[in-house]
């Protein structure tokens, strides 16, 4: 493993350096080959570095700026008027080859716009997509994309998302021939809108993609497929609904286990299993959505992420950088396009 540099928007998210800096310190303790460039207000960042070990601080660089992209900023406004923002400067470090990946918990639309303009998309890719990993009943990861970067998509864009999702599953999880499905209102070929039906027809013609057909919402967590593709409108609602249900289940389980002497006693006996279950159900365990299809690695964290959740997003960014995800997607897409045109 070689040394790796991560550019981190220290000011992004609901809590800024209060979360991003402690998570950075934890990540550096876990990975001795990692260096992190914290981009943001140096005075605020330094407040959270006072007690850090000297050996850890030696692997931190601070790039000072006081400008921040507000959560209320529209993407075009941020692109034109936030040229010295912590988010933009972090992305520029990736563009300039000074970092191998970028992470931000800030404004999603601004992150998408800046990343696309500064890093450009890969050959054959029209739009980047936000993708995240979801749990499944058989403990295998399921990738869902797009999560909101593209509210509406034509069939060609959905096809490109399917290719990128397949390569992501192969690269990050070493899944052999990942099963890819299109999220739809039914599994029959006549179901769904024109875009989804046409995307299905395109995927059926590509033997390199293990396309299994349509999948309905109740099968997302079944583990029957490895990659699920949809437009950003559907994907974002699906993800947020899932996170809400997961938090409800965790709350109800904790409440139930606290009622009655014998229930509390039983809960203590099986505490390790309960902790494992709660961890699997906790959305923070899966924090970090990748903006794939770019000539560089950009990861988006939840704005409300706590330290543990933000650390998870850092780990994701490092993993993708180590496995050279953009290059893997580009190589695979080039191979598929050559076969189509031959």
From Swiss-Prot:
Catalysed reactions listed for this entry: a fatty acyl-[ACP] + phosphate = an acyl phosphate + holo-[ACP]
One Gene Ontology term of the molecular function aspect: phosphate:acyl-[acyl carrier protein] acyltransferase activity
UniProt keyword Lipid biosynthesis present: yes
Pathway in which the depicted protein is active: Lipid metabolism; phospholipid metabolism
Keywords: Cytoplasm, Lipid biosynthesis, Lipid metabolism, Phospholipid biosynthesis, Phospholipid metabolism, Transferase
EC annotation from Swiss-Prot or TrEMBL: 2.3.1.274
Class of the enzyme per the UniProt entry, highest EC level: transferase
Assigned protein family: Belongs to the PlsX family.
Function: Catalyzes the reversible formation of acyl-phosphate (acyl-PO(4)) from acyl-[acyl-carrier-protein] (acyl-ACP). This enzyme utilizes acyl-ACP as fatty acyl donor, but not acyl-CoA.
Name by which UniProt lists this protein: Phosphate acyltransferase
Lineage of source species: Bacteria, Pseudomonadati, Pseudomonadota, Gammaproteobacteria, Alteromonadales
Gene name in the database record: plsX
């Amino acid at each position: 493993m070689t040394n790796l540099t991560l550019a981190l928007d220290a000011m992004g998210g609901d809590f800024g350096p209060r979360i991003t800096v402690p998570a950075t310190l934890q990540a550096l303790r876990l990975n001795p080959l990692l260096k992190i460039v914290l981009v943001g207000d140096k005075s605020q960042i330094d407040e959270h570095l006072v007690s850090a070990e000297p050996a850890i601080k030696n692997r931190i660089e601070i790039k000072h700026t006081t400008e921040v992209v507000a959560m209320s900023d529209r993407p075009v406004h941020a692109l034109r008027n936030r040229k010295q923002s912590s988010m933009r400067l972090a992305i520029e470090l990736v563009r300039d080859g000074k970092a191998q990946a970028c992470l931000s918990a800030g404004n999603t639309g601004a992150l998408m716009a800046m990343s696309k303009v500064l890093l450009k998309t890969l050959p054959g890719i029209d739009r980047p997509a936000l993708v995240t990993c979801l749990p499944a009943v058989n403990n295998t990861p399921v990738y869902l994309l797009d999560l909101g970067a593209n509210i509406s998509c034509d069939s060609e864009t959905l096809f490109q998302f399917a290719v990128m999702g397949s390569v992501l599953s192969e690269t990050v999880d070493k899944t052999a021939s990942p099963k890819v499905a299109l999220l739809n209102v039914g599994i029959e070929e006549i179901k769904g809108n024109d875009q989804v039906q046409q995307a299905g027809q395109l995927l059926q013609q590509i033997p390199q993609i293990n396309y299994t057909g349509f999948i309905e919402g109740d099968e997302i967590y079944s583990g029957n497929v490895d990659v699920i593709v949809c437009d950003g409108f559907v994907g974002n609602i699906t993800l947020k609904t899932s996170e809400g249900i997961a938090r409800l289940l965790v709350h109800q389980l904790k409440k139930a286990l606290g009622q009655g002497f014998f229930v509390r006693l039983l809960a203590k006996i099986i505490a390790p299993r309960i902790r494992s279950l709660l961890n699997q159900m906790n959305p923070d365990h899966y924090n970090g959505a990748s903006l794939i299809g770019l000539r560089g690695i950009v990861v988006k964290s939840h704005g409300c992420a706590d330290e543990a959740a933000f650390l998870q997003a850092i780990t994701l960014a490092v993993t993708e950088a180590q496995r050279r995800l953009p290059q893997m997607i580009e190589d695979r897409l080039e191979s598929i396009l050559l076969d189509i045109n031959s």
